[in-house]
Amino acid sequence: MNIAPASSAKGRRVFSVTLLATLLALGGQAAQARSSFEAPDPDYHGEIKASPVTGTAILAGSEVALDGRGFTPGQRITLSRGGVALNPDAAYVADAQGNFKATLRIPEDAAPGQHPIVISTAQPSGAAVFPLKVSPVVPLSGADAYSLTAVKLVPGLYQVDSSAKTGALFVTSAVGRPPVKVSQLLKLDPKDLAIERQLTPAAAPGADAGVYAVYGVGVDDRNGTVWTTNTRQNTVAVYRQSDLGLVKQFEPGLVPHAHTVVVDEKLERAFASAAMTPDIVSFDAKTPAVRKHITIESGVRGEQFAVVGMHLDPTVHKLYAVSLKTNEAAVIDAKTEQVEKVFPIQGAKTPMGVAHDPQTDRLFITAQGSDNLLIVDAKTGQTLHNVTTGAGALNVAFDPVKRLAYVTNRGAGTLTVVDPDGTIKANLELGTYPNHAVVDGKGVVYAVNKAKGQDDAEGDRITRVMAK
């Protein structure tokens, strides 16, 4: 019988204890690994929207209101940027409806741009990314070189156009969501900006359907008419310039989410953009009647061109359109109604407005998502100048007389004046939510803006801008 020495038995006891400790440690690590891989959310639909607590744009150093929706009740939400938690003290917790509200302060040194904010959730786990845009601050300048005259009109101003023949201005307005019951087409005297005539559109078909609210506007001096888009009814209407009498109300559904309407008087054709689709609908402006549908094919694989803003240059009979979703521009021959080219817009995120300079064949494209104006060679598609104009660069008008582009920056509340080489000549304060601008062919600019609320003294105005 062999008996192990005492030292050997002691060694076995040490080995057993060590083995047990190792197994316990491994078990703990395994448990920890399992806990970090908790059951994922099989039906994750959480989304977060950010808006400024004060002002009209998110800026460096400003406070942001977060509105979270679609989360699982009780779900814990942590936000981070570059691996740094933005709510390190405590996770946000979704309420019984799966929502949460919170505020967050943007660092003073935050760079302008769209920042990828990572959403990490627990109980159950999930992850997503949402873009948080921090807009640049472009200082006001050049006010001493311009004379601005502003007049308050009616609630909900959208677009403005002018008659080269009479000088009269035509302005559209609409208030609220469907069914829209407050909407007007205005005719203004350009001398004092007083309302000469105003019309509430006819009732739209259907029970409690509101009116044929007017949004986009385009003047046709050859036929003495003014075209409007009825966005909520997906169609267009034509009125007389003289007394705003209705010439024709086209049937609902003809132009899905009709946004912009422009007229080539020499060709006697009108064109309306079907927003967020690849389609533009052309009309015989004299009859008036539908001509055809023009479809723009995107160059981005698997994506669809989503036209919103559109411009017609009658000197070259070309249509220019931009795609909100694919960041592309299209050139269309208004005579043949054929798409000539489609190209990517370098430096643009969610482009909205477009204008053209026939002398240089340059496009001026505003991009709301990147807060800039892109000056693009229409022949090559190359971006020649990338100009930061301010929060929410929305629309642009080019004046061939003064050879300047005028950009309405919705979030910044400004009108930026830029030359064809990308130099900012002025940045003028324009009031709340500048929406649209037009040039009259004589070097005068008219811009309209919307109000932030009923008591906003700087909203719902038309402003005449003239160089001194």
Language model feature labels by segment:
Residues 1-32:
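Gram-negative bacterial Sec-dependent N-terminal signal peptides
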Residues 34-468:
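Predominantly soluble domains enriched in secretory-pathway, periplasmic, or organellar proteins
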